Curated annotation (Swiss-Prot):
Family according to the record: Belongs to the glycosyl hydrolase 2 family.
Protein name listed in UniProt: Beta-galactosidase
Magnesium is among the record's keywords: yes
Organism domain of life: Bacteria
Entries under Pfam families matching the protein: Bgal_small_N, Glyco_hydro_2, Glyco_hydro_2_C, Glyco_hydro_2_N, LacZ_4
Cofactor requirement: Mg(2+); Na(+)
Gene3D superfamilies in the cross-refs: 2.70.98.10, Galactose-binding domain-like, Glycosidases, Immunoglobulins
TM annotation in the entry: none
Residues engaged in binding Mg(2+) 1: 413, 415, 458
Organism whose genome encodes this protein: Vibrio vulnificus (strain CMCP6)
GO biological process terms held by the UniProt record: lactose catabolic process
Gene assigned in the entry: lacZ
C-alpha cells in the first residue's frame, strides 16, 4: 500500500515522466452491452454515472491536505458539497484566471508554485455482490489539472492531461456494500506547461465520472477503418478488435442501418497471440472485414450513419458482451494538392470552438453541444476545430450525427514558453507529448466526423512533433495531420495551416513571415493544400474584409477555407454590487496576471445570442449562391449554383421579392432542384411598371421546405440581393418657387423663421452653432449639431492583445497622438444672407490641437420656408493627420420613448460597416432604438448602418448618401467603459451621421488590420444632408 506521505514526497505533479500511473490503456469508448439488440439500439449500457453532489474541501497546497481524508471512516461531515462535474472556481472557491500567452506562474518547468490550490473530493458508491462478479472501472472524462485517486483508503493511481479520460480498474479495491472514493486534484502540475491555451484557467472534476461494468472476459478496444473503392461507390470496413479472453473465444461483427442488418455476421478468432513478461496471455487482436455495396456515404451534408455491433462469444458461441459504434463510409485523402472527401475537394467553412459555458465554465451539457452544432449549421459552418484540446466524448458523436467535419486537436500548447519550442525539442518531455497525442487518437479514432488530426497549437516545432506525426501516419494513415507551429509548413504537417495569414499582404513582423495565402500555394515545390487553422479574428466589432478571403477561396482550388477565431465570447456571468449582470473577462476576479478582454473574440455572446459578424460569416459561407445573368423589363434570369458537393437541393425553396425604393411590390417562390456541385438557370417573371428614378432590387431567400435536425422549416440558408436596371426615363425636376423664410439678426443671434412661424432656427454667431431648432414650438434637438471625427475605439483599433503597452502603430495610439476627440473648436466666421427662395447661414470652424490647426470645416445651411434645411459640409484636414476614424457630425435628439422606432432606407437590418456589409441588404427597415445598439462586452462604437438614403428619427427626416448610428450612449462614455454595466443610458438620442467611416478590420486584432481601401486617408471631404420635418 502506498502511503499518503510517499505520494507527497514523490511529487508526480512535477515529473513529466509521470503522465499516468495505473491507468488503463487508452481505447475507443466502451459501453458493455449485454445483448446484441441493446448494442444495436444503444440502450442499457453497463455504465453508471457518478455525477452528482460530492463532498469537497479546498486546501492551499497538497502538503496542507490531511492524508486521512482518503480513508473510508474519515469524518467529512463538516466538508462542503460541490457538484460533479464543475469547476471549483465557479462554485465559490479560488479564482478564475484568464491568460492568452502568459503562464499564471513563474516559468520553471517542470516545477509549479508551492501555492498550489488542491481540491479534495469524496463520494460513496454502493455495489451488490453480483456487481463484483464483473470488473469495475472508473472513468474520469476530464480533471484539471492532475489528480490522485483512492478507493476505500487504498491508493489507486494518478493521471494528468485535463482533456482526456483517465480510467482505472477498481475491481480489486471494491467490496460489496458501500465504497468510498477519494480524489485529490491539484490546480497546477507539470502538464500545465503544455496547457497554455487562450482560455480561462479553471480546475476540478469538470467532465463526467462513470463506473463501467464489464465481464472478466471482454472487449478492450475496437478500431474501425472505413474504405471506399476507387470509384467511391462500394465500401468496406476494416475492424480490429482487441479482447481480453482465451484463444477459443470469438468475435462477431455485424453492420446495421437502424434495426435492419445490412451485412451477414462475420465471426473470427484472435490472431498473433503473445505471452507477456508476466507469463500471462496478452491482449488478443482479431482482424475482420465487412463489405457493403453502394453504402450511403457520410459527409457533413449527408451524415448517413450505420451502426457496427462487435460481440464477444465464448467457445460455444454464447454471447458475453457487445460494443457498438456509429460508422460513416467516407474516404479522406490529399490528392492533386487538395484535401478531398469521397473524391471531392472540400471547402472548409470552419470555426474554432472552446468548450465554454458562461455559468458552468468548462462544463458542457449535451444540450449546450447540440445548441452550438445547430447554430453552426444554421450559419453555414461545416467544420469545427476543437481548439485547443480534445473535447467531451459526446461532442464527436453529435458531430457524426448532425454532420460537421472535425479537426481534432491534441491538448498541447506552450505559447508562453521562451522559446516556444523549448519543451517541444526536449526529450524529457517526449513521453508527455506522445501520450497526449496518441491517447486522443486512440479514443477518437472511430468517428467519421474527424477528418484531420492536429498535433496541438502554438508550441513551436521540435522533435516531439516529428515523433507524433510519424506515429500518426503509421497508426492511422487514413487521415491527414495538420500543425501550424514552426511556420505552418514544416514536415510535420500534411496541410499548410497558417494562422492569420492575409489574402494579399505579407505579414513580415513575425518570427516566421506569413506569406499572402495566394502566394503561399504557388511557392516552389509547395504542393500541399492551404487551410487556415485560424483566421478572421472576431474580437468585438470585427470581421472586416471577410468577404475577400471567400473570394480567394472560391477562386483558387488549393485555398480550401479555414477556421474563424473563434466561436463564443468566453465571458463569465457576474453581477455587480447593484445586482446588474455583466460578462466578466480577465482581471475581473482579481487575477493579476491576465490578458483582459482578449477572451472576448467570438461570433456569438456567451449566452449564444449572435453578433452581427455572424451574419457576414453566414453570407460569405453560403452553400447556394444566386447571380443575375440577364434582365429585361418583364423577366430576370438567375444562375443558381449549388456548392453542396454531395446533395441535391431537394429541401430548398427559392423565395424572391421585388423591391421598389426599398418596399416589396411583388413576390414569388420556386422549389429548387439543383444537382450537387452544379448550376441551373431560373427565370423570374416580373409584373410591374417602373417609375422614373425609382430603385429596384431583387431579393432571393433560399429556405428549408421541411425541418431538419438542425433547423426548423422556413429557415433561410442563403440570401442574395441584385440591383436591377430601371427601364423608365428620368423624372422632371421640381423647381422651388416658395419665398424665402424670414432672417433676423439680433446681437449674436441669427434667427431664421418660416413665414407662418412654424419652423424656426437660431444660431449663436460667436460659437457658430445651431442652438435651437423648433417645429410648432417643439424642440427638435437637445444639443447643437457638431463635427464628429471620433469613434469609441474598437478592439481592433486598440491592438493590445498580446502586450501590456499600446502599440504606437495601433489606431487608437495614433488618434490619441493627433488629439482626435480632443480638438478645440473655434468659430472663424458665421454669416447669413437671404436669397430668392432661401436663407443661407454659413459657418467656418477651425479645430486646434497642440498649437496647430488640425481641421477646417465649413457648414453651409440652406433653409427653406417649408422647414427643409440643406446642409453642405466641407472638410479640410491637416496633412500630418493619420487616417481618420470617421468624417461626419453628431446631434442630440429628445428621447420620447424607450422603444423609439428608427426607420431608414439603406443597408440593414443588422449592423454593418464599410468593410463588413456583404450580408446587408438595401431596403426599408425599422428597428427600435435598443435594437440599433450592439452590446459588445467590451464597449465600443457599434450600430452603424451604411448606404443610407433616408432616415427618420422622431419627427426628423434626413436624406442624402450617408451612414448613421443612433445610441443612448455618448462616444466618450463608450470609450471609457470597460463593461456594459458601466454604461448609463442617457435620456436622449445621440444621432451620428457619417459621410465616411473607417472599416473595422479583423484579419487580426493586434496589428492595424483595416485594409487601405477602407482607411480615410484623403485630406478633403465634402458631403450634403437634407433635413426636413417627417410630417412635411
Amino acid at each position: 500500500m502506498t502511503a499518503f506521505s510517499e505520494i507527497l514526497q514523490r511529487r508526480d505533479w512535477e515529473n513529466p515522466q509521470s503522465v499516468n500511473i495505473h491507468c488503463l490503456k487508452a481505447h475507443s469508448p466502451l459501453a458493455s452491452f449485454r445483448d446484441m439488440a441493446h448494442a444495436r439500439d444503444g440502450i442499457h449500457a453497463q455504465r453508471q454515472s457518478l455525477n452528482g453532489q460530492w463532498k469537497f474541501k479546498l486546501f492551499d497546497a497538497p502538503e496542507q491536505v490531511d492524508g486521512q481524508f482518503t480513508q473510508a471512516d474519515f469524518n467529512d461531515a463538516e466538508w462542503d458539497e460541490i457538484p460533479v462535474p464543475s469547476n471549483w472556481q465557479l462554485q465559490g472557491y479560488d479564482k478564475p484566471i484568464y491568460a492568452n500567452i502568459k503562464y499564471p506562474f513563474d516559468v520553471n518547468p517542470p516545477f509549479v508554485p508551492s501555492d498550489n490550490p488542491t481540491g479534495c473530493y469524496r463520494t460513496r458508491v454502493s455495489l451488490s455482490p453480483e456487481d463484483l462478479l464483473n470488473t469495475q472501472r472508473i472513468i474520469f472524462d476530464g480533471v484539471n489539472s492532475a489528480f490522485h485517486l483512492w478507493c476505500n483508503g487504498t491508493w489507486v493511481g494518478y493521471s494528468q492531461d485535463s482533456r482526456l479520460p483517465a480510467e482505472f480498474d477498481l475491481t480489486s479495491h471494491l467490496v460489496a456494500g458501500e465504497n468510498t472514493l477519494a480524489v485529490m486534484v491539484m490546480r497546477w502540475c507539470d502538464g500545465s506547461y503544455l496547457e497554455d491555451q487562450d482560455m480561462w484557467w479553471l480546475s476540478g472534476i469538470f467532465r463526467d465520472v462513470t463506473l463501467l461494468s464489464k465481464p472478466q472476459h471482454c472487449i478492450e478496444d475496437v478500431f474501425i477503418t472505413p474504405e471506399l473503392d476507387a470509384c467511391y461507390r462500394d465500401g468496406s470496413l476494416s475492424i480490429v478488435t482487441t479482447i481480453a479472453a482465451p484463444e477459443t473465444y470469438q468475435v462477431q461483427v455485424q453492420l446495421f442501418e437502424g434495426t435492419q442488418a445490412v451485412t451477414e455476421p462475420n465471426i473470427a478468432r484472435p490472431h498473433n497471440r503473445r505471452i507477456d513478461e508476466r507469463g500471462t496471455w496478452n491482449d488478443d487482436v482479431v482482424f475482420q472485414t465487412l463489405h457493403l455495396r453502394e453504402p450511403k456515404k457520410w459527409t457533413a451534408e449527408t451524415p448517413n450513419l450505420y451502426r457496427l455491433v462487435v460481440s464477444l462469444l465464448d467457445e460455444n458461441g454464447t454471447h458475453l458482451e457487445s460494443e457498438a459504434y456509429p460508422v460513416g463510409f467516407r474516404k479522406v485523402e490529399i490528392s492533386e494538392g487538395q484535401l478531398k472527401l469521397n473524391g471531392k475537394p472540400l471547402l472548409i467553412r470552419g470555426v474554432n470552438r472552446h468548450e465554454h459555458h458562461p455559468e458552468l465554465g468548462h462544463v458542457m451539457t449535451e444540450e449546450d453541444m447540440i445548441r452550438d452544432i445547430c447554430l453552426m449549421k444554421q450559419y453555414n459552418f461545416n467544420a469545427v476545430r476543437t481548439a485547443h484540446y480534445p473535447n467531451h466524448p459526446r461532442w464527436y458523436e453529435l458531430c457524426d450525427q448532425y454532420g460537421l467535419y472535425v479537426c481534432d486537436e491534441a491538448n498541447i500548447e506552450t505559447h508562453g514558453m521562451q522559446p516556444m519550442s523549448r519543451l517541444s525539442s526536449d526529450p524529457q518531455w517526449a513521453h508527455a507529448y506522445m501520450s497526449r497525442y496518441t491517447q486522443m487518437v486512440l479514443r477518437d479514432k472511430n468517428h467519421p466526423s474527424i477528418i484531420i488530426w492536429s498535433l496541438g497549437n502554438e508550441s513551436g516545432h521540435g522533435s516531439n512533433h516529428n515523433a507524433m506525426y510519424a506515429w500518426s501516419k503509421n497508426f492511422d494513415p487514413s487521415r491527414p495531420v495538420q500543425y501550424e507551429g514552426g511556420g505552418s509548413n514544416t514536415t510535420a504537417t500534411d496541410i499548410i495551416a497558417p494562422m492569420y495569414a492575409r489574402v494579399n499582404t505579407l505579414v513580415a513582423d513575425e518570427a516566421v513571415p506569413k506569406w499572402p495565402i495566394k502566394k503561399w500555394i504557388s511557392l516552389p515545390n509547395e504542393t500541399r493544400p492551404l487551410i487556415l487553422c485560424e483566421y478572421a479574428h472576431a474580437m468585438g466589432n470585427s470581421l472586416g474584409s471577410f468577404d475577400e478571403y471567400w473570394a480567394a477561396f472560391r477562386e483558387f482550388p488549393r485555398l480550401q477555407g479555414g477556421f474563424i477565431w473563434d466561436w463564443v465570447d468566453q465571458g463569465l456571468s457576474q453581477w455587480d454590487e447593484n445586482g446588474q449582470h455583466f460578462w466578466a473577462y480577465g482581471g475581473d476576479f482579481g487575477d493579476e496576471i491576465n490578458d483582459r478582454q482578449f477572451c472576448i473574440n467570438g461570433l456569438i455572446f456567451p449566452d449564444r445570442t449572435v453578433h452581427p459578424t455572424l451574419q457576414e460569416a453566414k453570407y460569405c459561407q453560403r452553400m447556394i449562391t444566386v447571380s443575375l445573368q440577364e434582365q429585361t423589363q418583364k423577366a430576370c434570369t438567375l444562375l443558381v449554383t449549388n456548392e453542396n458537393l454531395f446533395r441535391t437541393t431537394d429541401n430548398e425553396q427559392l423565395n424572391w421579392s421585388l423591391l421598389e425604393n426599398g418596399q416589396v411590390i411583388q413576390t414569388g417562390s420556386q422549389v429548387l432542384s439543383v444537382e450537387a456541385d452544379s448550376q441551373t438557370r431560373l427565370e423570374i417573371a416580373l409584373n410591374f411598371t417602373p417609375k422614373a428614378q425609382a430603385q429596384y432590387y431583387l431579393n432571393t431567400d433560399i429556405c428549408l421546405i421541411e425541418a431538419t435536425s438542425w433547423a426548423p422549416a422556413g429557415h433561410v440558408v442563403a440570401t442574395e440581393q441584385m440591383a436591377l436596371r430601371n427601364h423608365a426615363g428620368l423624372a422632371m425636376p421640381t423647381l422651388r418657387t416658395q419665398p424665402a423664410p424670414k432672417l433676423t439678426e439680433n446681437g449674436h443671434a441669427i434667427v431664421v423663421s418660416s413665414l407662418d412661424e412654424k419652423h424656426q432656427w437660431r444660431w449663436d454667431s460667436q460659437s457658430g452653432l445651431l442652438m435651437e431648432w423648433n417645429v410648432d414650438g417643439k424642440a427638435q434637438m437637445l444639443a447643437a449639431p457638431q463635427d464628429n471625427f471620433f469613434r469609441a475605439p474598437l478592439d481592433n483599433d486598440i491592438g493590445i492583445s498580446e502586450v501590456d503597452n499600446v502599440d504606437p502603430n495601433a489606431w487608437v495610439c495614433r488618434w490619441e497622438m493627433a488629439g482626435i476627440g480632443q480638438w478645440e473648436r473655434h468659430c472663424v466666421q458665421c454669416e447669413s444672407e437671404t436669397l430668392a427662395h432661401a436663407v443661407v447661414v454659413t459657418t467656418t470652424f477651425a479645430y486646434h490641437f497642440g498649437g496647430d490647426v488640425q481641421a477646417i470645416t465649413q457648414w453651409t445651411h440652406t433653409l427653406s420656408n417649408d422647414g427643409e434645411m440643406l446642409l453642405d459640409v466641407d472638410v479640410t484636414l491637416a496633412d500630418a493627420l493619420p487616417p481618420m476614424p470617421r468624417i461626419g457630425l453628431e446631434l442630440q435628439l429628445p428621447l420620447h420613448q424607450a422603444d423609439t422606432p428608427i426607420t431608414w432606407q439603406g443597408l440593414g437590418p443588422f449592423e454593418n460597416y464599410p468593410d463588413r456589409l456583404a450580408a446587408a441588404r438595401f431596403g426599408l427597415h425599422t428597428q427600435t432604438l435598443a435594437q440599433m445598439h450592439t452590446p459588445y462586452i467590451f464597449p465600443t462604437d457599434s450600430g452603424l448602418r451604411c448606404g443610407t438614403q433616408w432616415l427618420q428619427v422622431n419627427e426628423l427626416a434626413i436624406s442624402g448618401d450617408f451612414q448613421f448610428s443612433v445610441s443612448q450612449y455618448a462616444q466618450q462614455q463608450l470609450a471609457e467603459a470597460k463593461h456594459t454595466h458601466d454604461l448609463l443610458a442617457q435620456e436622449r438620442i445621440y444621432l451620428r451621421l457619417d459621410h465616411q467611416h473607417m472599416g473595422v478590420g479583423g484579419d487580426d486584432s493586434w496589428s492595424p488590420s483595416v485594409h487601405k481601401e477602407f482607411q480615410l486617408t484623403e485630406k478633403h471631404y465634402r458631403y450634403q444632408l437634407r433635413f426636413s420635418p417627417a410630417s412635411r
